[in-house]
Regions:
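Conserved catalytic-core segment of nucleotide-activated headgroup transferases in glycan assembly
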Residues: 8-74, 97
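Helix-loop-beta element that forms the nucleotide-linked donor phosphate-binding surface
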Residues: 1-9
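A short helix->loop->beta-strand "cap" motif at the edges of active sites that frequently abuts
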Residues: 1-2, 103-105
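Short, polar loop motifs at secondary-structure junctions
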Residues: 1, 53-58, 109-114
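CheY-like receiver
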Residues: 71, 131-135, 152, 169
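A charged, aromatic-enriched C-terminal amphipathic alpha-helix characteristic of glycosyltransferases
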Residues: 13, 139-177
Length: 178
């Protein structure tokens, strides 16, 4: 029998793209579970010109849907480093970068996660330090990537689109012999 993989829908409304960074002091936000957060070696990144806010279920800023939205709106971009060597990393969904794109923000990540690689035309997937430099030096390209990313999310991750995927799966499964 067939196997179906259906992504999570985005829960966020699409917001305007805003990217006018101060190259001397970027505002950035990270959000993720404490389990993800404790796997990150922040010391390997040059964050000397980055005012980073960290949101997780155990703090320092405690996660909640509304809080995350507010901090993303205050940021120039979203930093989402991951530990690519951790066994579970490869199986993560792409809800975190999708959320950022939906809110009109560029994502910088080092993720090699297959679901995140689907977004590589719209987010930075590679060296975090190089991604920060790229964003500062290429604001027009960043805006274009986020515009295209929002279109991709709109076409693939809205509740309406995901509902249609579930209906398709239901209809296929409904034809199987028990």
């Amino acid at each position: 029998k067939q196997v179906f993989v259906i992504p999570d829908p985005t829960e966020r409304e699409e917001e305007p793209i805003i990217f006018k960074p101060n190259p001397h002091r970027l505002n950035a936000v990270y959000y993720g579970s404490h389990g993800n957060l404790k796997q990150i070696d922040w010391g390997q990144y040059d964050l000397s010109k980055v005012n980073l806010k960290i949101i997780s279920n155990e703090g320092p800023i405690f996660w909640d849907f509304k809080i995350q939205g507010e901090f993303v709106r205050q940021s120039d971009l979203v930093l989402l480093p991951v530990n690519n060597d951790h066994d579970m990393t490869q199986y993560k969904g792409n809800n975190r970068p999708i959320d950022a794109l939906r809110q009109g923000r560029f994502v910088i990540t080092n993720a090699m996660i297959p679901s995140w690689q689907l977004l590589q035309n719209f987010i930075w997937c590679g060296d975090i330090n190089e991604g920060i430099k790229y964003a500062i030096n290429n604001p027009d390209e960043v805006i274009k990537k986020v515009e295209e990313g929002q279109k991709f999310v709109r076409n693939n991750y809205t509740p309406e689109k995901i509902t249609k995927e579930w209906e398709r799966v239901y209809n296929v499964c409904d034809t199987w012999d028990s």
